[in-house]
């Protein structure tokens, strides 16, 4: 797994020490409502392992995201493609205290660059819950265009935003 660095962030391989903040994020229903829902610690552990395993299965996935100045884990961002999903998806989440600071934009720009330059992705989308206004705004800031909706197993109807 390649490490990506931006002006303020480091996107890196997951470590066991990330679990505390990962589990804390998923324990909060407000945080987790758009990323599969609230999880108890055992479910969160399995979900973090899923993030790590995606790299082995597909050769890409989500990175753990640290703030470069503090080395603090602030969330994750990356690329995903579940079986049956027609395209590569760009996604992210940040712990509450780091939202609204432009970190998601910065991390997503790095992920888009990786998708285009390393994976040579011809197509990249974000599947966004229609109630998730902050993620819709971010997709638009990234230059993505709304293309309709898709029904995702276990997640329901989501807006499709295409990144050009």
Regions inferred by a protein language model and the residue ranges of each:
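Active-site rim helix/loop that mediates acceptor-substrate recognition in acyltransferases
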Residues: 41-59
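Acyl-donor (CoA/ACP) binding surface of acyl/acetyltransferases
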Residues: 1-34, 49-53, 64-164
């Amino acid at each position: 797994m390649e490490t990506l660095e931006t002006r303020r962030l480091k996107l890196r391989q997951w470590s066991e020490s990330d679990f505390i903040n990962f589990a804390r994020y998923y324990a909060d229903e407000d945080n987790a409502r758009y990323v599969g829902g609230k999880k108890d610690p055992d479910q969160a552990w399995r979900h973090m392992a899923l993030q790590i395993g995606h790299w082995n299965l597909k050769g890409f996935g989500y990175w753990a995201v640290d703030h470069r100045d503090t080395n603090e884990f602030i969330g994750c961002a990356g690329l995903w493609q579940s079986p049956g999903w027609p395209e590569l998806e760009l996604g992210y989440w940040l712990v509450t205290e780091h939202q609204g600071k432009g970190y998601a934009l910065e991390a997503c720009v790095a992920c888009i660059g990786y998708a285009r330059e390393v994976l040579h992705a011809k197509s990249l989308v974000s599947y966004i819950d229609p109630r998730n206004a902050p993620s819709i705004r971010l997709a638009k800031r990234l230059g993505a265009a709304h293309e309709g909706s898709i029904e995702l197993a276990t997640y329901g109807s989501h807006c499709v935003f295409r990144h050009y």
